[in-house]
Amino acid sequence: MTAVSAAREISFRILAKVDAGGYASDLLRGETVALESRDAALAETLVLGCLRYQSQLDFLIAHFAGRPQPKLDLEVRIALRLGIFQLRYLDRVPAHAAVAESVELVKGARKRSAAGFVNAVLRKVNRAPVGWPDRATELSIPAWMLERWELHYGPAVARGIAEAALAEPVAYVNPATGRRQDIGAQSIVPLLEIKPGMTVLDLCAAPGNKTAQAIAAGARVTACDRYPRRLAEVPAEAARLVLDAAEPLPFSTRGETARFDRILIDAPCSGTGTLAGNPEIKWRLQPSDLFRFQARQRKMIERALPHLRPGGLLVYATCSLEMEENEAVVEGFPVLATHSRIPGRDSGDGFFAAAMREGR
């Protein structure tokens, strides 16, 4: 019996949890903390690689199994994805380890009857080029998502976005805060044009990277979020406040509405600009979700604008590439300018932002 390495066992477990609705980055952070750095790095490579290339891997399962769209239990499919990813996409993993440990993972998941099938399929895997059946499989992206990007951005930019989602994200550090922060995310707070001493309301502030940027620019920040646990990550220099999504913003006393010089709405969104680091979004998101996000996002702007001082500036931002969450959300509001970053065209994640001025 072959022993399964900690990295592969944890990867197998995390991928099953992601399929059940978990988030890969959170699960990796929690489950690899006790591993040696080499094993933790391998687990991250396996989990994120299998998610990034999921549709290619599923096509390759059928290709090497000699069956179109074989019906497989989840545990068997995950073991095959892990095995094929190691055999075709990684260079320094011994083939015998990739095959033998994938077989043992299936046995350990009480799918012993499928062990022979997994072994037979993985032993056929080679690195010969295959003909992908369509662009969506080639780029490992849902067809509906690729098609809408092609319509909105054009085929070349859409391909660049999809290819960027297959790459490992580059780690950036914000020199003003010393925090790890994507280069695209760093571009949002400067749109607020903060001057020292200004008051800033940062809605949806966790994990606090943009809050830290505003503080570094000299602002006095009130940082808000719905989740107390996440709000704990926000810099202590900010006034921190937990919001109830069903209640109005709690900034009015004795009939007086509190106002801020600047408001940042870093809105919850689909996250399609962050697929390189959060590849499970590709397989989880549905077109109808965009309209659900849109309704919440417009409501956030409507609730926040009354708290902006006359002449103040509000910046609405998402890490989405979708019109429904961006241009369509800010339509009808007093927009001064918009800003966008597109993966493949620009470094880092994708973002949209719109600056609005309150003239009352």
Residue map of PLM features:
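S-adenosylmethionine
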Residues: 1-360
